[in-house]
Amino acid sequence: MVRICVFMVFLLFFAPSPVSAGFYTNSSAIPPQLLRNATGNPWNSFLNFTGCHAGKKYDGLYMLKQYFQHFGYITETNLSGNFTDDFDDILKNAVEMYQRNFQLNVTGVLDELTLKHVVIPRCGNPDVVNGTSTMHSGRKTFEVSFAGRGQRFHAVKHYSFFPGEPRWPRNRRDLTYAFDPRNALTEEVKSVFSRAFTRWEEVTPLTFTRVERFSTSDISIGFYSGEHGDGEPFDGPMRTLAHAFSPPTGHFHLDGEENWIVSGEGGDGFISVSEAVDLESVAVHEIGHLLGLGHSSVEGSIMYPTIRTGRRKVDLTTDDVEGVQYLYGANPNFNGSRSPPPSTQQRDTGDSGAPGRSDGSRSVLTNLLQYYFWIIFGLFLYLV
């Protein structure tokens, strides 16, 4: 019994802490105090570095170096925690690579346009992996010459992949996904992810089915705050919004401290509040990572790393479609246009054995009690 108590204390204090994130159908539903907190994005302080250039020293510049290191632009790991405020060659090279990736004027100077891009909320996945950027390179797929005209045309693709081009194996085309039960998500929130999966399902031979058993699903989805066990801690509202891992890992984590809009009305466009993030827009992007896509330098594409607050972007572009079809092929029923998303597909394989039962309406406390009950019960059976 003592061993069980010790184990429970360990779980309570050291296990990743899921959070009950804030979900709102529209801006008027967001409490005013949360809107005020959301506007205090610490990244906005980077705007004070406008005009900074190599050879100078600026107070607080070390924080911008930490930003660039997090997203892969600075690879010198021995400098972690020891960055200076000097605008050195390391930072200049990082700025130049960032400007190339986002198709900005490459100067190595922290001009206004560059810094305005830097402070936009974004995906937590890096743009540069092991010192190599795939965002700006593109791939020339074909070239056509016209005799007598001296003209050449070529098509360039901007989609990218994780190193090694990982993908789900051919024998796993019906992928399952589940939500961390400790988040106690409602059906309204879960339906947002269903719509997001459908957008990728329509253009590939893959299918996505919601199940209840979180521990055995191909894709696991959860909302967390701060450090949550994967070495990629979240950093508060309006900075890194979410991250997802390459196949076949299947982990999809979202920042539980954001104000999430779940209305899901219409296609691309703007939502009515600038201090909130459209959940479906972020979900569609992160599912692209789950399938093996990296970031794209095409600003209108789903796989572009940033999304402006108040923006809704959910429609796959040609770049997104061609990238995922390179990995998996096309859906034989796809004709180049989207149809309205079908109703949510769900196959209940939960431990409860109750067909069709959903945990979406249960409280956070109920889910936590059930979660720890099964841990204690399992340990009891093991020890006796």
UniProtKB/Swiss-Prot annotation:
The active site is at 286. One of its GO terms (cellular component) is side of membrane. InterPro entries: M10A_MMP, MetalloPept_cat_dom_sf, Pept_M10_metallopeptidase, Pept_M10A, Pept_M10A_Zn_BS, Peptidase_Metallo, Peptidoglycan-bd-like, PGBD-like_sf. Mostly expressed in leaves and roots, and, to a lower extent, in flowers and stems. Optimum temperature is 35 degrees Celsius. Its cofactor is Zn(2+). It holds the Pfam family PG_binding_1. It is found in: Cell membrane. Residues 22-158, 359-384 form a propeptide. A motif (Cysteine switch) lies at residues 121-128. It is a lipid-anchor; GPI-anchor. Residues 1-21 form the signal peptide. Its EC number is 3.4.24.-. The conserved cysteine present in the cysteine-switch motif binds the catalytic zinc ion, thus inhibiting the enzyme. The dissociation of the cysteine from the zinc ion upon the activation-peptide release activates the enzyme. Belongs to the peptidase M10A family. Matrix metalloproteinases (MMPs) subfamily. This is Metalloendoproteinase 3-MMP. It comes from Arabidopsis thaliana (Mouse-ear cress).
